[in-house]
Regions:
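Residues in soluble alpha-helical coiled-coils and helical-bundle/repeat scaffolds
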Residues: 39, 53-57, 61, 78, ...
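Hydrophobic alpha-helical connector segments
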Residues: 61, 72-100, 148-161, 171-172
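Short, basic, alpha-helical segments at the C-terminal edge of helix-turn-helix-like DNA-binding modules
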Residues: 64-69
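Amphipathic alpha-helical segments used for helix-helix packing
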Residues: 96-121
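Hydrophobic/aromatic-rich alpha-helical bundle segments in the mid-to-C-terminal region
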Residues: 117-121, 142-207
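Short, solvent-exposed amphipathic helices
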Residues: 119-133, 137
Length: 207
């Protein structure tokens, strides 16, 4: 039997993940069996288990893949992008919206599944770290005006660097609270409401 190429392996893994997500959305994580995933994927059990140890492994990989998608999206933002810029980018990105909705539906159908809790335990800290990194140049620019922070990073004092880090972190937390509220409200609202909800959320964030 010929060895699979890296591209084929990646395609198989993606095929398995998408099949599993479809099952999780339909039945809930708890009620989905590996047999369900195998059937939905159209692959053999041997093929599935050559890539993943079980459905929790698939779930963790799916979440990490979606985090990587978010990270890649943030990396497309120009240096100095602020909270409103980030929200606009997310608002107009269908992949992020679809991923958020899918994860919310999976979580809602399996609220008490310990595997879900384990798989998502690091999601918030990782997401916060991505946002903090994105907002740090913006925070430095804002504080250089408000607090006379030196715009040249090589000439800043440790106290100034700490102030920038705190401001970026606090703004990231504020952004995450507004963003999650906006996405949750949009999820339970109508498609026609989404643009209005985006404008409301954007108005709550600094430029």
């Amino acid at each position: 039997m010929p060895r699979l190429t890296d591209a084929t392996k990646a395609a198989r893994r993606a095929q398995i993940i998408e099949a599993a997500i479809s099952c999780f959305l339909e039945k809930g994580y708890t009620n989905t069996s590996m047999s369900d995933i195998i059937k939905a994927s159209g692959l053999s059990s041997g093929s599935i288990y050559s890539h993943f140890s079980g459905k929790e492994d698939i779930l963790i990989t799916a979440i990490n893949k979606r985090l990587n998608n978010v990270k890649e999206l943030y990396e497309t933002l120009p240096e100095g992008a602020g909270p409103q810029d980030i929200l606009e980018t997310i608002h107009t990105n269908q992949l992020v919206n679809d991923n958020f909705s899918a994860m919310l539906r999976i979580r809602a159908k399996s609220l008490h599944a310990p595997e879900i809790a384990r798989a998502t335990a690091d999601t918030m800290p990782l997401l916060q770290g991505i946002i903090v990194k994105t907002l740090t140049p913006w925070a430095a620019e804002q504080l250089s005006v408000l607090h006379e922070i030196n715009p040249n990073s090589a000439q800043r004092t440790p106290e100034q660097e700490a102030l920038i880090a705190d401001y970026a972190r606090d703004t990231a937390d504020a952004f995450m609270m507004v963003f999650q509220g906006y996405m949750l409200r949009s999820f339970f609202g109508t498609p026609k409401e989404k643009d209005r909800l985006y404008r409301v959320a954007s108005a709550l964030l600094p430029e």
